[in-house]
Amino acid sequence: MTRSLRVLYIGLFLVLLLALGAWSLRSFFGFSTNADATVLNGRWTKAVETHYDEEFPIKRLGTNLWAALDYKLFNEGRPGVVLGRDHWLYSDEEFNPAVNEDQNLEGNYALVEGVRQKLKAQGIQLVMAIVPAKVRLYPEHLGEVKPASIHANLYQDFHARVAADKIIAPDLLGPLQQAKLGGKQVFLRTDTHWTPDGAEIAAKQLAKTIADKTPLNGEPQRFVTEAEKTEPHKGDLRLFLPLDPLFENLMPPKEPLEKRVTHLAETKGDDALFSDSETPVALVGTSYSANPNWNFVGALKQALGSDVISYAEDGHGPILPMLSYLKSDDFKNNPPQVLIWEFPERYLPVNNEIGDADPSWVAQLKQAGSRQQNMALNTPVNHQKSETPDRAQN
């Protein structure tokens, strides 16, 4: 390479670098940080570095190119998603084996029973809403990747264990399968979660079981659900395919999502069912309950004919929100008649986070539940009708 070519090469490289840097600097117009981010505590510098790193075009270009190669050549996304056929995406939590899965299973079974005892001591009836895995309802869209063996009978085994502990837990899989056969989409194609239709079906099944086995006090209230609007929904599983903006056309298409809202029908003041101090039904759970996109809380209100106070949390699994609720003032001072615990089956074989809960207290809950389960295993089985789903449904 001659000296002139070297100079030209270096010059072009510097021009390209300066151009890309200038492009990135455009993003700082209007950029601001939180009030607590200062130069002295280092947070301002960190915020600037993070913002620049996110906006630097070379990084975005490289990320998009690598993701496109993975997606088109190997039919793979980032860890977190499993690609199916027909643009269907699944959470890899429904497929992967878990570290110490057998130990986690027993620990979580014991914790559920320990929670039941804690609630019973407060006069609260526990009702489990075990959410079946999306792959259990839509296996026909799977590609070559199959769930690990631990997931095969997880839903049915979960029901069998809570039935042995005499915990009310209606089968949600059967009604969801029937609705699917009837033409309704009960889980979103590119999202982990159920559709508003799926949430409504689950709510109706829960309400029917509660009415049969632990009826609510008082006269029912009338709630009305209305469709607000239908919008294109960017499923949470699409985030594991970082193809936009350069290869947006390769992404599984967005799907329409009907937003619904539920409100109390207009009634006379004398018709109020519960006073302000009463809580007929509480709900603890995950994003299946907490995210308003699915309107699960609203569907429960309408199906139960009762107000529902939600303590569900997004992004923390089913265990942490329950532990937080058991330590709350509402649990101590205003206990509900019924508490619905929404618990996706995929969280059962994993070591769930407990946040800032005292580990010794959590261990005590598990020990109490384990003792009760050991007693149940040593008690002769009374053959009676159970809501445990048939394994043949899987």
Curated annotation (Swiss-Prot):
Membrane topology classification: Peripheral membrane protein
Keywords annotated in UniProt: Acyltransferase, Alginate biosynthesis, Cell inner membrane, Cell membrane, Membrane, Periplasm, Signal, Transferase
EC number: 2.3.1.-
Active site: 191, 193 (proton acceptor), 287 (nucleophile)
Protein location: Cell inner membrane; Periplasm
GO process terms (BP): alginic acid biosynthetic process
Keyword Cell membrane belongs to the record: yes
MF-aspect GO terms: acyltransferase activity
Signal peptide: 1-37
GO cellular component, one term: plasma membrane
Function: Together with AlgI and AlgF, forms an inner membrane complex which probably interacts with the alginate polymerization-transport complex and adds acetyl groups at the O-2 and O-3 positions of mannuronate residues. Acetylation of alginate is important for the architecture of biofilms and increases the ability of alginate to act as a defense barrier.
Record protein name field: Probable alginate O-acetylase AlgJ
Gene behind this protein: algJ
